[in-house]
Amino acid sequence: MSLLGKYAGTHTADSAEMIAARERVFGEGLFEPLSGAIGAAVSDPRLEGVKGAVVDLGAGPGLYLERALEAAPERIGIAIDNSKFAARRAARCHPRAGAVVADIWDEIPLRSGSAAVILNAFAPRNGEETQRVLAPGGHLVVVTPGPEHLKELIEPLSMISVDVDKEERLHEALGPLANSLETSTLEWNLKLRRTEVADLVLMGPSAGRLDASEFESALERLSYPLSVTASVIVSTAVKTSTSESNHS
């Protein structure tokens, strides 16, 4: 289902090639530590008694939503992304999942209080709408790249570097939800083949700004297997009565 408006920013949507690269990366298990952390966050005992779906905002192909639903067998999942290629794949990520093509910068097409968990991994954040859709006692799980993330690739492959103000901007975007933010950092080492390095670059925001021939030449100059740092920050916020009253 597509709910994109006439003037929606589809130019920012992931391409079919980006989605395919992401699926190959996950198929190799390169982000398994993060997938495990998301599963643990969704099965947090504090969520017992909180009714609602697992909603993945900026879901991509639904690979994190799939792990979340495996960890929460009593819940359904909803993937929302502005890429039709991502949504098609996300709709098939799990038998209890559905997908909607929509721009999460606009009004999220869900009832107020209908989400027990909202996932937001490497995606834009709409704090006001997240606050509205999240049920009382529900959890928001945000994943952002850490300062060391893929540091060995940024300069040689002309990748976009991590924003040094990302944490500050996260707090600003979340509004009252930021008051309950709990943060942890996950780091692990990857030993990568040439094809895996290429896919890590091509699945992300750097893909659209690379010259194909220069990228191939840069890949050739690296030595494999290449040791690369993966570093992500997992932040969890709980919607409390205080955050609700602050929002109103």
Residue locations for each model-derived region?
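Class I SAM-dependent methyltransferase Rossmann-like catalytic core
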Residues: 11-37
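Conserved class I S-adenosyl-L-methionine
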Residues: 49-60, 139-169
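Conserved SAM-binding loop of SAM-dependent methyltransferases across substrates and taxa
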Residues: 61-73
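Conserved SAM/SAH-binding beta-strand->alpha-helix loop
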Residues: 81-84
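A short acidic, Gly/Pro-enriched loop at the edge of an enzyme's catalytic core
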Residues: 105-117
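A short glycine-rich, Lys/Arg-flanked "PGG" loop and its adjoining helix->strand segment in the class I
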Residues: 127-141
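Conserved Class I S-adenosyl-L-methionine
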Residues: 184-248
